[in-house]
């Protein structure tokens, strides 16, 4: 599955100082963000047969580690996202990711009280 990954080990280590209520709030917001990325990516996906759009999924099975994956297993997805020398790029995943992670960062700041 194609995916975007952020490595934020220092941030995750700093979460140990917070109680479970705060951690649960962060996990909830992360899930919401992941589902919003999926939703927005599907909206922006070019549709011919609908296969690519239908293949975009979200995996939150590692939410306890603050990890979510949004992606597709369709082999031609990177060609659509990034283009080829004969075909212009038609990004769908990266714009959805960037839009929603900005919102997530603000929500995380609010939950952590600006810390």
Regions found by a protein language model. Name each.
Residues 1-115:
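Short, Lys/Arg-rich flexible segments
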């Amino acid at each position: 599955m194609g995916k975007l990954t952020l490595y934020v080990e220092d941030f995750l280590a700093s979460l140990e100082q917070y109680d479970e209520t705060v951690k649960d709030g962060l996990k909830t917001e992360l899930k919401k963000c992941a589902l919003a990325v999926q939703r927005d990516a599907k909206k922006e996906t070019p549709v011919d047969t609908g296969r690519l759009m239908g293949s975009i999924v979200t995996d939150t099975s590692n939410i306890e580690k603050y990890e979510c994956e949004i992606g597709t297993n369709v082999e031609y997805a990177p060609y659509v996202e990034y283009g080829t020398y004969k075909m212009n790029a038609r990004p769908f995943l990266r714009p959805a990711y960037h839009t929603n992670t900005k919102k997530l960062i603000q929500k995380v700041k609010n939950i952590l009280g600006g810390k």
